[in-house]
Amino acid sequence: LATLVLAVLAHAAGNVINDVHDAQSGADAGNTSGIFPFTGGTRLIQLGMVSVRQTRDLARALMLLVVPGGLALALWSTPALLWIGALGLLLAWAYSAPPLQLMSRGLGELTVAAVWSLVVIGADAVQRGSVFIIPVFTSISYGLLIANILLINGVPDANSDASVGKATLAVRLGARGAAWLYALLALLAHGWLAWGVWQFIQPERALWGLASAPLSAAAAVLLWQRASTPEQLRPAIVLTIAAACVHGLAMAAGLLSMRWM
C-alpha cells in the first residue's frame, strides 16, 4: 500500500512539474487543439484557477512527501529502492525542466517509458527485498505501451508544441510518422512479452497481458485513419490508455493466479 501511495504521489509531482514548465514556455496557453482532459495540460493555470507559483509550491510539497517516504520504504525493504527512486525522480524532473527538457528533444516518450518501468521494478523490489530479472524484463512491455500514450497525445498538441520549440516525436515525425511508430511500439510491446514467455524468462500465465493487443491494434488503426484530423483522436487515445491498463492488470492477474491454480 505504501508503494502504491508513493508511486501516485511521485506521478502527481511529475505532472505538476510539467504543468509549470508548459505554462512558462507558453505551450499550454497556445494550445487550442488539445483534447481535454487527455492532452494540452490540465489548463488550471491558463484558466486562472491557480498561479504558476502555487503550482510550483504544490510540486515542492509533493516532493517533500515522496523523498522521505521513499527513504523510509527503502530502509524497510531494500537499499536498491534508493537508486530506483532517485533515477525515477531525476527522469521525472528532466522530462520537462531545463536545462535537459527531454520532452523537447524527442526523448520524452522514452523517458516516461523508463520511469514507469522503474515503478514496476521498484514495486517488486519492495515485496521481494531485492531486484529480480523477471520484473525487469516484464516492465519493458508495459513501458512501451505507456510511451504510446505520450506519443498519441502529442499528435493533437503538435502545432502548439512546435510553436514553442517543444520538439516531441509527434512534431519531429509528423502525424503519419507517429502513426507508424505507434504501431511499431505496440507490436514490440506484445512481441516482447510473447518472446519472454517463449524463452522461459516469464511464466506462461504472463501471456494474459496479451489481452491488450486488440485495444492497441484498434487504436493504431484509428490513429492511421485520423492522422490528418487529430481533433478526432479521442477514441484512439482512450483505447491507448485502456491498452496500457489492461496489459498491466491482466499480466498481474495471470501471475497472481499461479498462487491458487
Range-by-range predicted roles:
Residues 198-258:
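Extended hydrophobic alpha-helices typical of membrane-associated regions
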Residues 1-5, 67-83, 120-140, 191-206, ...:
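Helix-coil boundary and interhelical linker segments in multi-pass alpha-helical membrane proteins
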Residues 110-124, 171-175, 238-251:
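Small-residue-rich segments of transmembrane alpha-helices in multi-pass membrane proteins
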